[in-house]
Amino acid sequence: MSQAWVPGLAPTLLFSLLAGPQKIAAKCGLILACPKGFKCCGDSCCQENELFPGPVRIFVIIFLVILSVFCICGLAKCFCRNCREPEPDSPVDCRGPLELPSIIPPERVRVSLSAPPPPYSEVILKPSLGPTPTEPPPPYSFRPEEYTGDQRGIDNPAF
C-alpha cells in the first residue's frame, strides 16, 4: 500500500502551494488582464473580496444602521425608567411590570364602623332628568297604524 501513487498529484499539489490563496501566477498589465473574480494588484492578480457587491451593499448598510438605532432606543428607554425612579439602590428589571398608583384616594377607602351607613337614596347615583314628563310615552309597536288604544283580549281573526 505504501507504493501506491496517484498520477498527476505532484504537479497539482505543487501548483496549489505556489499559487497561494490570494495570488495567482497570472501577470497583469496593459496587455494581460486578470481572470473573472480577480483584480489587478500591482504586478499580479488578487482575488476580489467584496462581500456584498452593488445595491445589496446599500441595503445591508441601511438595515444595520436602522437595527443599531432600534437597539440604542431600547437601551435609552430602559435607562430612562431608571432615571425617573427615586430609589437608585434597588435593582430594576427593564422587562418587569410597572406598579401603577391606585385611583381611589386613601381618605375614601377608610370607613368608620361606629357610624351608621348613609341612606339608600344617597348611595345610588341618580341622573338629572330635568322636569318630570306630564304626558305618557307613545305606545311601542312594530305596526303603529293598527294601534287603536287599549285592546283587551285576543286579537286573532281565527277566534
Swiss-Prot record:
Q: Which InterPro entries match?
A: WBP1-like
Report the superkingdom from the record: Eukaryota
Q: Which UniProt keywords apply?
A: Membrane, Signal, Transmembrane, Transmembrane helix
Q: Specify the protein's topology with respect to the membrane.
A: Single-pass type I membrane protein
Subcellular localization(s) per the UniProt record: Membrane
Q: Which residues cross the membrane?
A: 58-78
The chain's Extracellular topological domains, given as residue ranges, are: 27-57
Gene Ontology CC: one annotated term: membrane
Q: In its UniProt entry, what is this protein called?
A: Transmembrane protein 92
Q: Which taxonomic lineage does the organism of this UniProt entry have?
A: Eukaryota, Metazoa, Chordata, Craniata, Vertebrata
